[in-house]
Amino acid sequence: MGVSTLTTFQKSAINQEFLERCVAALEGAVTAADAPAAVRLLLADAASGGVDGSAALFELNRGANKSLAPFVAKLKDVKAKIDAESRPGQAGVSWGDLTFLAARSAVKQSFVAAKVARFEARGVEPNSGAIQAISSPFPVQLGRKDAAAAGPPRELPAPNASPAEIKEWFAGIGTPPKGSNRPLIFARPALILWGAASADGAAEEARLAAGDAELASAKAFYDRSRLTASRTDYEVDAAEAVLRLASARSGAVINEAAYLHPVTVEQVKIT
């Protein structure tokens, strides 16, 4: 059965199996401690024309990107594992998708680590069921096309960049939503993403908030959320920020049929 004749259910099953394979491979290699590197790689990719894998493939010799080489080496092993399990006729995972999924995996694991620490601080034994019950979904979109060459150079902000410089840098990514004058990555997602990309996210958020009223308001909002058991407002907005950064609006070229492959009827079971 060729790709063009697949039913909607079959396409969904194939894409779900592919996603689960990618997630399993990443969770065995990427941890919460990798979140700063994973998010910085995603930022570097988005900044050079959209998430298309160019940061990992062609741009590791640029300034701050050089420090990401060990993390990219880890992702190469993950990619090899994912691709080795591809079905006949199925494309290997793109570097654009792997960059997005790695950031998603590391950030999700940092959420879990925060909840575990909160349970333990209260003298409660954490368990996966309880953590899952208070966790928010982290949306996924796959099918990013990889670049054939390096994108336009755009360095990540310096460690001592001012709040205004951070906001301006993020405002330069992608195009605003239709009918909106607000940047694609406005103050709130900028605070989340830059905090997540920093070795000490709490300290960096505090530094930015101390010098900018808009960022201070965003930090206060998320601090209140992070004091709750579910951390819903913070985690939902963080997931949206990561997805927005890797979206078509940031410059990614996305083909949702990228990982479909020919199948026999027996290969895709509808349950």
Regions found by a protein language model. Give the residues of each.
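Long, well-ordered alpha/beta core segments of mature domains
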Residues: 2-271
